[in-house]
Amino acid sequence: ATLLQIFARNAKRGTALALENGTAWSSDPRELAAADLYILAVSDAAITTLAESLPIPADAAVVHTAGGIGIEALPARFDRRGVLYPLQTFTQGRSVDFAKIPLFVEGNDDSFTSELEAFARNLSRTVYRADSDRRVRLHLAAVFACNFVNHLYALGGEILHGTELPFDVLKPLIAETAAKAVDSGDPHRVQTGPAVRGDLPTLRRHEAALAHDPRLLRIYESLSQDIWESSKKTSYRPKRSFSTWTA
């Protein structure tokens, strides 16, 4: 497969990406290159508008890259339309090894799904077929495993404010926690902390330390409760009933 063109409104990003990939760039729809496959890597809200506005031939293949949006976001005038969803977080300036990113594909029929699957295997070692319902669940799982977790990192940094301790002190802990979760295959099995242990004195001290910040206290109590409830579904059993913590 050959990348023929980067089409982007942002000239700086578009030209930089085109230069990096040794291809052409344009922001003018009249200069849109003829291609076998058009990949719309834009925000969810922009998918339909962009697909309708570009002069893409009806017999061309068109896909978007959104996890939580179905094929129906693409106009029905395209004979071959689908989804090519990479399960990864992307940030400008950070490189990722695309071969290690799971790709999830769906086409509007079996034939095009097979084509997309073959194309995806040129990009990644891990490719799955996933219809809209499965992708919505997958996208939701990714929000919990990525976006929410990163927010908790930020809250951890907030709690350190005023201690003269940098966020760097948390980095080895973050790395080891993530590594254990990945290696275990079931993060429930490697859950640690006062909530899963039923350590009431520590829970009380933490609650007292957060008494000045109702927002963080609410989050702390909610997560502690859920860790406790989740632990009851595994082979690990805390020594204390959660109801006795809040009594």
Enumerate the predicted regions with their spans.
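A general structural signal for well-ordered alpha-helical segments in protein cores
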Residues: 14, 35, 47, 71, ...
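Interdomain hinge/lid region at the active-site interface
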Residues: 177-238
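Short internal beta-strands
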Residues: 5-9
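Internal alpha-helical scaffold of NAD(P)-dependent oxidoreductase catalytic cores
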Residues: 2, 13, 17-20, 95-183
